[in-house]
Regions:
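Beta1/beta-strand and adjacent pyrophosphate-binding region of the FAD-binding site
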Residues: 1-11
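Conserved Rossmann-like nucleotide-cofactor binding loop
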Residues: 11, 41, 290
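Glycine-rich FAD pyrophosphate-binding loop
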Residues: 20-52
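Mid-domain catalytic core of redox enzymes
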Residues: 22, 258-401
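Conserved N-terminal glycine-rich FAD pyrophosphate-binding loop of Rossmann-like flavoproteins
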Residues: 40-74
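Mobile amphipathic helical/loop "lid" adjacent to a hydrophobic cofactor/ligand pocket
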Residues: 74-204
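Helical element adjacent to the flavin cofactor pocket in flavoenzyme catalytic cores
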Residues: 209-274, 278
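Conserved flavin/dinucleotide-binding core of flavoenzymes
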Residues: 349-498
Length: 498
């Protein structure tokens, strides 16, 4: 039996990894597993670049790195990823470490700026009244996330109308009027799945709090946010190496797949070289939904319709030295720097955030970098104005640290499409995985989807059958997946390394 996974992002790697592991743990004739990636590297939006800043104060070359896409994770909620990291020998302290978890909010004209810390830091601390409202919002919204009453609410509707009802303790809710415009809406515009057309206000309340719950611990256990030492690409490289050396998975880069169902199974062709083909019995499409529409030549109309519901937007990510994108007061610089948009302004409101890379990599806790005189550098997603070429960082080969990354919009249509595609998994021996198909598409969610698809494939391959199920209620499905993500009962002693 031959299984081809098309798409080498975390979603595709998760399917291949878990399928190989499932056969090792449950037995049976293991299939041939290959992962086809159109690009030259695996990992999807996990992309790291390295730079030289010349000679440092100690006379040695000063080298740094920056993640242009995926750059951190919440160890508390990433139960499955944590277990995989343990198994492959990717350990806390050496390979990933706690980041500095700080956030600033500011307007472009510098009239408003504050950090999320109540304790004053040279006059930049948030107003305690606003901080109290933020804490109240996170506590109440974290509970309401599990209440079906808000399934069709937008974020703006929740912020505006929720105070009309008492809180869980029966007391009136008195949120500061600055809560939405100066904190919640700007912060959501710093989330990768937001729509630039409609902005944060029209996003589903469930979608926003889904992310807040998993990545930032809202309504649950406190988050332990980690950065990847030497970048997220190093984690992907460690995972890929383990899969090839220990699990026998073939990873094939530079194969821009096109697939068609035939009487014998699936024929997959390299679109850049039609002479390169391979046959498979089962196909897992772990690409973005809009790419799947193009590369699967024999899609059923109902499947194509579900895929077409997923909207994508492209973001530009730049590593640079241009401090004009930060708060005017350097004392307000934080790991995450969120620009406040003027309420009601007529403009696109794309995913936008600027990281102070030194803080994200927690230089203050690293003796190698916690020294006076070292350069400060940044990563900006969708900067509000062009960054001069002279300020864009470059690697040793002269390549600019610029990346263009697609993200699906986690809107009401996406929530419905996830339920629809779940009911069509396995039809025509075709399965779907990847960020768009499971929750907000965080790596932990991609991994959980990989576990689920691997189980379906195992049942199909071993002859136990895997009948497609009726479409679940979209919000009930989202809620059940959220309960599963970060469930502490899923933690167990890591298996012995093979």
């Amino acid at each position: 039996m031959r299984v081809a996974v098309i798409g080498g992002g975390v979603g595709g790697l998760a399917v291949a990894y878990n399928l190989a592991k499932t056969f090792r743990s449950k037995g049976g004739a293991a299939p041939e597993i290959c992962v086809l990636e159109a690009g030259s590297r695996f990992g999807g939006n996990a992309e790291t670049m390295h730079f030289s800043f010349g000679t440092g104060p100690d006379g040695n070359e000063l080298r740094r790195w920056a993640d242009l896409g995926v750059n951190d994770f919440n160890k508390t909620a990433y139960v499955e990823i944590d277990k995989v990291m343990d198994e492959i020998g990717f350990v806390e302290g050496k390979d990933y470490r706690p980041l500095e978890d700080s956030t600033s909010y500011y307007t472009g004209d510098g009239a408003v700026f504050f950090t999320d810390n109540v304790a004053p830091w040279w006059g930049t601390g948030v107003d305690p009244a606003l901080k109290a409202s933020v804490d109240s919002f996170m506590a109440i919204a974290g509970r309401d996330l599990h209440d079906d009453s808000y399934r069709d609410w937008t974020l703006e509707q929740y912020v505006t109308e929720r105070p009309n009802s008492p809180g869980p303790d029966g007391k009136p809710i008195d949120w500061d009027p600055r809560l939405g415009p100066q904190v919640i809406y700007p912060r959501v515009n710093g989330m990768y799945f937001v729509s630039g057309e409609t902005g944060a206000r029209k996003m589903p309340f469930y979608a926003v709090m889904h992310y807040y719950h998993i990545q930032e611990g809202a309504g649950g256990a406190p988050a332990r946010r980690m950065y990847f030492v030497e970048g997220a690409s190093r984690w992907i490289d460690a995972l890929s190496d383990y899969m090839t050396r220990h699990l026998g998975v073939r990873l094939i880069p530079g194969f821009r797949a096109e697939a068609a169902r035939t009487a014998q199974g699936w024929r997959i062709t390299n679109a850049d070289d039609s002479a390169k083909t391979l046959d498979a019995d089962l196909v897992v499409c772990a690409t973005p939904a809009n790419a799947a529409l193009k590369l699967i030549r024999t899609l059923r109309p109902d499947v194509a319709n579900s895929l077409a519901q997923i909207r994508y937007e492209t973001a530009i990510s730049v590593a640079h030295l241009d401090s004009r994108l930060l708060p005017a007061d350097t004392n307000a610089w934080c790991t995450y720097n969120i620009r406040i948009l003027e309420p009601g302004a007529a403009a696109m409101k794309p995913y936008a955030i600027t990281y102070v890379a030194n803080r994200h990599q927690n230089d203050a806790n690293d003796p190698d970098y916690n020294r006076f005189g070292l350069p400060t550098f940044f990563v900006s997603i969708n900067p509000p104005y062009p960054i001069p070429e002279s300020m864009v960082l470059k690697d040793d080969d002269g390549r600019e640290a610029v990346a263009y990354m697609q993200h699906n919009v986690f809107d009401f249509a996406c929530i419905r499409a996830q339920a629809q595609i779940g009911a069509r998994q396995g039809v025509d021996d075709l399965y779907f995985a990847g960020g768009w198909s499971y929750g907000s598409g965080l790596h932990e969610e991609c991994w959980l989807q990989g576990i689920d698809i691997a189980e379906k494939l195992y049942s199909r391959i071993t002859g136990r059958g895997d009948q497609p199920q009726a479409a679940a209620d979209p919000h009930a499905l989202l809620a059940s997946r959220l309960r599963r993500t970060g469930d502490p009962s899923r933690r167990e002693a890591p298996p012995e390394r093979t």
